């Protein structure tokens, strides 16, 4: 099944509708991110599944998240890595939760624009968000946190 790219506004609308249908998800916007822990969780969960290029993306993410160098350190290949984390069924849900929380942290820091810009062609985040009601609860919560901050 081919995913159809949709606009950011349509994704917001879909998520709002599904939150209304399935009950509220409470979003903590108190700047209480545990971004280093989330990054460590992501690494621990996926490092053995990553090829050399993907491990390089993890090193770049370390510069972004842990060393606070900004998203400009992420290479173009980050989008492919993001797609693997969000869309590969054999990758664990914990990896998606950690990645979404890291993206939410980036959004809170006004540092997500570059990532969204890289995603303008493939719409990986928006296509993932379209399946909101079919996601595990922890993924729904993390995605709602990301969208809530972007809104």
Q: What residue ranges belong to the model's regions?
A:
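Fungal intrinsically disordered, low-complexity polar regions
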Residues: 3-4
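Alpha-helical solenoid scaffolds in large eukaryotic transport, assembly, and signaling factors
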Residues: 7-151
């Amino acid at each position: 099944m081919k995913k159809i790219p949709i606009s950011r506004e349509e994704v917001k609308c879909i998520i709002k509708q599904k939150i209304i249908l399935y009950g509220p998800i409470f979003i903590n916007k108190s700047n209480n991110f545990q971004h280093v822990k989330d990054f460590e969780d992501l690494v621990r969960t996926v490092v053995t599944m990553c090829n050399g290029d993907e491990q390089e993306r993890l090193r770049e993410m370390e510069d972004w998240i842990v060393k606070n160098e900004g998203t400009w350190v992420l290479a173009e290949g980050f989008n492919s890595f993001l797609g693997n984390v969000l869309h590969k069924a054999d990758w664990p849900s914990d990896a998606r939760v950690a990645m979404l929380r890291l993206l939410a942290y980036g959004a809170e820091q006004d540092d997500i624009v570059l990532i969204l810009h890289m995603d303008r062609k493939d719409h990986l985040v928006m296509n993932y968000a379209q399946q909101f009601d079919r996601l595990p609860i922890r993924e729904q919560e993390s995605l709602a946190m990301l969208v809530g901050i972007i809104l």
